[in-house]
């Protein structure tokens, strides 16, 4: 593994970790504030919270996996699912944003997921 490969993977891991902290703390407070003030049923509000934090957990898993691969490059195959999910997530944000959900293009999700996929790929290629 090249010196730069380690740093590419660690940049991807850092983006995911910072994203996880922001999403899990700041984003959750803002999002759940809006959801809790809505007329949604309590079960829907609870499921919304679960869905929100499933993505937070995904960000943690991405950060952990990319950092692990940076230190143990023999396990670089573990980065491929992280690259794929981040890439498909970025495409989903863009696809929906180009349709009826234009506000998604103003959110950082597509860009951060795309950049994470790029740095992870650079780190293992």
Please place each PLM-identified region on the residue numbering.
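Core segments of alpha-helical transmembrane spans in multipass integral membrane proteins
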Residues: 14, 18-30, 43-71, 83-88
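Hydrophobic alpha-helical membrane segments
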Residues: 55-56, 79-93, 111-117
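Helix-boundary and loop/linker segments of multi-pass membrane transporters
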Residues: 1-5, 35-43
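Non-cytosolic membrane-interface motifs at loop->transmembrane helix junctions
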Residues: 3-6, 77-81, 101-112
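Small-residue-rich segments of transmembrane alpha-helices in multi-pass membrane proteins
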Residues: 47, 109-124
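Helix-coil boundary and interhelical linker segments in multi-pass alpha-helical membrane proteins
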Residues: 1-13, 66-78, 120-125
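Membrane-helix boundary connector in multi-pass membrane proteins
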Residues: 72-73, 91-107, 120-125
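Short juxtamembrane and helix-loop transition motifs at transmembrane-helix boundaries
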Residues: 39-47, 66-77, 93-99
